[in-house]
UniProtKB/Swiss-Prot annotation:
Chemical reaction(s) catalysed: glycyl-tRNA(Ala) + H2O = tRNA(Ala) + glycine + H(+); a D-aminoacyl-tRNA + H2O = a tRNA + a D-alpha-amino acid + H(+)
Coiled-coil stretches noted in the UniProt entry, renumbered to this chain: none
Gene that specifies this protein: dtd
Physiological role: An aminoacyl-tRNA editing enzyme that deacylates mischarged D-aminoacyl-tRNAs. Also deacylates mischarged glycyl-tRNA(Ala), protecting cells against glycine mischarging by AlaRS. Acts via tRNA-based rather than protein-based catalysis; rejects L-amino acids rather than detecting D-amino acids in the active site. By recycling D-aminoacyl-tRNA to D-amino acids and free tRNA molecules, this enzyme counteracts the toxicity associated with the formation of D-aminoacyl-tRNA entities in vivo and helps enforce protein L-homochirality.
Official protein name in the record: D-aminoacyl-tRNA deacylase
Keyword annotations: Cytoplasm, Hydrolase, RNA-binding, tRNA-binding
Organism: Roseobacter denitrificans (strain ATCC 33942 / OCh 114)
Catalytic class of the enzyme: hydrolase
Chief place where the protein resides: cytoplasm
InterPro entries (UniProt xref): Daa-tRNA_deacyls_DTD, DTD-like_sf
Length: 148
């Protein structure tokens, strides 16, 4: 699985002009399932993200995780994280997981975060979404479970 994380002071996602998910302080997580990903992959990624110390402590150092700051996660599916731009000018997306499997893993990932006591809001899998955010930092991280 691939995830692009952004530390935010607020974020929301809308479909057809209607807000379907919103958080204040926390992480906006764009997520993409890849071929070969499993429920175990999802659980490991959720655990890793829940432990990431990317929030400032009283000394201003990135030393606190999401739970320690009372933050939430907004999880948004984004198959374009699987883009292959190695040839030509149009990205290819054949490396993304199959839609039915990807949707199941997207939903599993949100559940895995909730099981770790992280409040979670979500987008709508496969929908054309409008995402708004106020980046905090900015802090943006790329995680790929294929990298270990």
């Amino acid at each position: 699985m691939r995830a692009l994380l952004q530390r935010v002071s607020s974020a929301s996602v809308a479909v057809d002009g209607n807000t379907i998910g919103a958080i204040d302080h926390g992480l906006l997580i764009f997520i993409c399932a890849m071929p070969g990903d499993t429920k175990d992959t999802s659980a490991r990624l959720a655990a890793k993200i829940s432990r990431l110390r990317v929030f400032k402590d009283d000394a201003g150092k990135m030393n606190l995780n999401l739970a320690q700051t009372g933050g939430a996660a907004l999880v948004v599916s984004q198959f374009t994280l699987a883009a292959d731009t190695s040839r030509g000018n149009r990205p290819g997306f054949s490396g993304a997981g199959k839609p039915a499997e990807a949707q199941a893993l997207y939903e599993q990932f949100a559940q895995d975060l909730r099981a770790l006591d992280i409040p979670v809001q979500t987008g709508q899998f496969g929908a054309d979404m409008q995402v708004s955010l106020c980046n905090d930092g900015p802090v943006t991280l790329w995680l790929d479970t294929a990298d270990g």
